[in-house]
Amino acid sequence: MSDAERRSGTSFRVLRRRDFAVFWSAALVSNTGSWMQTIAVPFVVYQMTRSTAWLGFAAFMNFIPAMIAGPFGGSYADRHSRKGILLVTQTVMMISSFTLWATWVTGVATPGLIVAIVFFSGFVAGINITTWQAFVTQLVEPDELVDAVRLNSMQFMGARAFGPAIAGIVLQAAGASTAFFLNAASFVLVLAALAFVHPRSQVFSDTGGSVLGHLRDGWRLVRSRTSLFLPILMIGVVSLLGTSVIQLAPAIAKEMFSVGRGAYGLLVAAFGIGAVTGSVMVATIADRMLRSLVANIGIVGLSLGVVALGLAPAYGVGVAAMFVMGLAYLLLATSLNTGVQARVEDEYRARVMAIYLSSLLLGVPLGSLVQGKLAEWVDLRAVIVGSGVALLGFAAYTWLRHARLRPLDESLIGPAPTAVPPVG
């Protein structure tokens, strides 16, 4: 694809690749199911315990194992077939989801048992997500990589919109058991898609040496390039202070707005709907904007959205704040993700993405755990507002310390984005 052809269209052009389109569509359905479960788990845990500390603990136990397993999965995915790894992880995650459904319908579920199942699934998910991020790039040509990354982000965020919305309806009409079952069944689509697609040949890293040695090589590469280290630092802090707030949504719905399960699903869905809106914007105009500019807009918008959520006087305002948070987060996360993908060679890709995702996955549980505990000691609104203000301070620091985030604009692959200087 020529430079002129690439700039004449949008990122949606990559859906003309049959394998990418098939995998993308199946992933959208399956991840929608996963988000249904993600919403249903804290809902039932909070329903059983009425504790924000339990909410934070459940999120912590979900994300921490993924953070631990992710780097090892990245090392393995750089040395072995990523398609084969995904076939195994998707199968195990399907079995785990059916187990969660079975414990709930048989009435043996307890908060501890639910968290234990989620904890196990988190380890597998850590290997799955790092491999997934690298595998997607094998379904397109090298000069389409950035478009594929953007569409993959759009798919994840679309699922984040549809999943909570459907979960709210399902929880209201049929209960948590149906939400758990639909998620488990959705894995069949991804397994079928994996059997169908034929990825590009993979550039394998050296299969010798230890896993820790491979991880050290990946970390040295990250530390040697500000264009890699900066987005990894940013996504970790954003997860710690920004998106971790979403894990408190059941308490926000109940304690701040006094609404039920359907409205709770809509509150979380608003974040996803905002993210879908942002992903459409990114897919259509991002080639004409610097990643640094988009990231700056995103982190400031997310910070202000978190503050607005904490100050929201009514449910409708809270929904609007979540929409803004989702839109801003998508702008930021896509810029950071594509910034990393554009600056790493294929033989290092899974390891570097594992470090990136570990930063993200560490921030969410730590933030949720601390915020959940603080919310039991002080006002929930104060905790949320404080998180937003702290994130805004971090945004100012990175803007000043790293030349308005210009390292994000560096690239090893494809044409550089057209520079659109800021007005003024």
Feature locations, PLM:
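Alpha-helical transmembrane-bundle signature of multi-pass membrane transport and export proteins
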Residues: 1-424
